[in-house]
Amino acid sequence: MGRLRRRQEIIDHEEEESNDDVSSRRGKLSLAETFRWLDSSEHRRIETDGHNDYKYIIHPKNRWYKAWEMFILVWAIYSSLFTPMEFGFFRGLPERLFVLDIVGQIAFLVDIVLQFFVAYRDTQTYRTVYKPTRIAFRYLKSHFLMDFIGCFPWDLIYKASGKHELVRYLLWIRLFRVRKVVEFFQRLEKDTRINYLFTRILKLLFVEVYCTHTAACIFYYLATTLPPENEGYTWIGSLKLGDYSYENFREIDLWKRYTTALYFAIVTMATVGYGDIHAVNLREMIFVMIYVSFDMVLGAYLIGNITALIVKGSNTERFRDKMNDLISFMNRKKLGRDLRSQITGHVRLQYDSHYTDTVMLQDIPASIRAKIAQLLYLPYIKKVPLFKGCSTEFINQIVIRLHEEYFLPGEVITEQGNVVDHLYFVCEGLLEALVTKTDGSEESVTLLGPHTSFGDISIICNISQPFTVRVCELCHLLRLDKQSFSNILEIYFHDGRTILNNIMEEKESNDRIKKLESDIVIHIGKQEAELALKVNSAAFQGDFYQLKSLIRSGADPNKTDYDGRSPLHLAACRGYEDITLFLIQEGVDVNLKDKFGHTPLFEAVKAGQEGVIGLLVKEGASFNLEDSGNFLCTTVAKGDSDFLKRLLSSGMNPNSEDYDHRTPLHVAASEGLFLMAKMLVEAGASVISKDRWGNSPLDEARLCGNKKLIKLLEDVKNAQSSIYPSSLRELQEERIERRKCTVFPFHPQEAKEERSRKHGVVVWIPSNLEKLIVTAAKELGLSDGASFVLLSEDQGRITDIDMISDGHKLYMISDTTDQT
């Protein structure tokens, strides 16, 4: 219970409400700040939660209630001292003391009533409780009974009972009010405005005086328990000091009797009595033995506390020292009331749990330390040119990891050629950047004033310090460790690119940065290469969120790796449809070739990613293989029918020729591969095309002797001859030269803006331009094909069908728009 009560007192301790004169390491500052718990906006929200629902509930920090507490404290001191005296010296109070006693009991009765309306702090949740039922129940089960019985008019009850002696013993219940005095001293010890040594000595003196005062009253009471005719058998009745005798001591002046009893109690407690006052009867001897035994414990308590004061080793002393340092710090930095309340409240809670640390602010939670750092350092960091355009999250991470440092004029902070471990920001003062020449002389490069930084280029570019920094005036700097800075850049890499851009922009007006331009450019190149690898890695792993974050942060999605592969190549081969679509919308070239001549479409077809193939074909992707005929012939020779089917369905020309002018159908016919030959002719392969030796696929089939294959090719030949009545050479050329193009429904100048919102269409190139326009308009959902014209990528108008090559990108616009 004692520990819980002490915890309650620590938490409920009133914040400093008067002017404090606090000594700091940098001089004396006058702390004229009022700490009121309810004046803090954050604590007001927490503390008054539910207060408006109970209008008659009193907050424990209410100033009128605090005044009432001091008023009751005075009565508690009076009652604590007068109760033993009333018990020992009075059998029936005189009229003037009786009236005073009644007034005191009325005051305590009023205090009992008030206790039912005073909110309290819950020791488990640390929230203020305003609910009347909980307040009443808490008081009823704790102090109510003793407080209420203590207010009984025991003097009247004693007289009404016929002066029954046992009734007088109930007076001691009023000593329960001593707890108010004890609680007052506990609060006083934690009040950093009052000298701790003075507070402790005052408390120890009060303990000693109160114990001896109570013992003196009991000593006198024991003497009065014997009738007057036997008073010679008491310590005071038999007492004779010099020529003065204490016979008939009841008639001696009250003050003299009390002084004599107090003298007896004090010399007995100190065990230095000379025997002039001593116990006479058995009851007095028993009490003296008990009292002396108690005095040994009391003496040990007093000596132990005095020793603790001398060595300054108590928890309270350490707590007070820490509070003084904190108040000095908060005063010097002019922290707001809300932040002050959080800091002091947390330190008081740590003291209650006996938690200590030698480093100031180390005990404070990270969230509160972050608030302090943002309040103190954020205005400086925001003005540093190095961080111009950086995100708020990045700057906040920088701010909460800063450390303050002060340097005197003439001090060298960092020297030229040294490895840099810290990044510095100038808050106040002036520094000079110096370069040491080969002959040992120093040349001033620039001056560093407030809101500048140094050590940044060395850390970012991983080079030695290019110049020496020396203090010219008293400087207040903020230091950031290299490792912390590097860790932050690992997470906020896009802000790292912004920092590099800021450095490059500054080189135009800063000669010292111009000299380091090559190092900066090399580092930028390395960073871009690393960023490209990160983008490709995210695409390969299917990390859509990371990929989007990288590209949104400025990474180029068209950057390739060491094999020339773009993120689209990797996403296509892995089958990530969402990433593929996102990269297409970001403008990645769908026909970009890697070092092996493969496009994203080829990678998707090779891996059998049907969904990705559809997306790429819709966007006009093609294979663009330099030796497509040889590749198709090899595929047929391997017998990979599934791969061949995907190639043909994705738009690869089935009439592509190898170096011997052989088509894939030639190979299939010569090997007797019926299924693959059927697949090729269904895709439009020509049966009448001839190789360098003049052989057609049908000739190869006849040499192979596969009757089923021969019949298939003869039927196809007859069908092709009936459909195309022109010469076989023209038919062969038409089949071999079959081409396709991609038509987009917007102007070439709008390509970048419209690409992510409008899609084109891939169509076969017909025999004339009019058919192409009509077909494209129909596929694009345009109304009248005759009212449109086709433009090339360089905005030139297409006037003839022969101007269009295979894979050409065209742009369809209105004829009226073209004329304007």
Curated annotation (Swiss-Prot):
Q: What is this protein called?
A: Potassium channel GORK
* Comment block on domains: The segment S4 is probably the voltage-sensor and is characterized by a series of positively charged amino acids. The pore-forming region H5 is enclosed by the transmembrane segments S5 and S6 in the Shaker-type (1P/6TM) and contains the GYGD signature motif which seems to be involved in potassium selectivity. The KHA domain (rich in hydrophobic and acidic residues) present in the C-terminal part is likely to be important for tetramerization.
Instruction: Write out the ranges of the repeats annotated as ANK.
Output: 528-559, 563-592, 596-625, 627-656, 660-689, 693-722
Q: Which SUPFAM superfamilies match?
A: Ankyrin repeat, cAMP-binding domain-like, Voltage-gated potassium channels
Secreted among the record's keywords? no
Cellular location of this protein? Membrane
Which residue ranges does the entry give as Extracellular-facing topology? 91-97, 163-168, 225-259, 280-285
Q: Where is the KHA domain?
A: 740-820
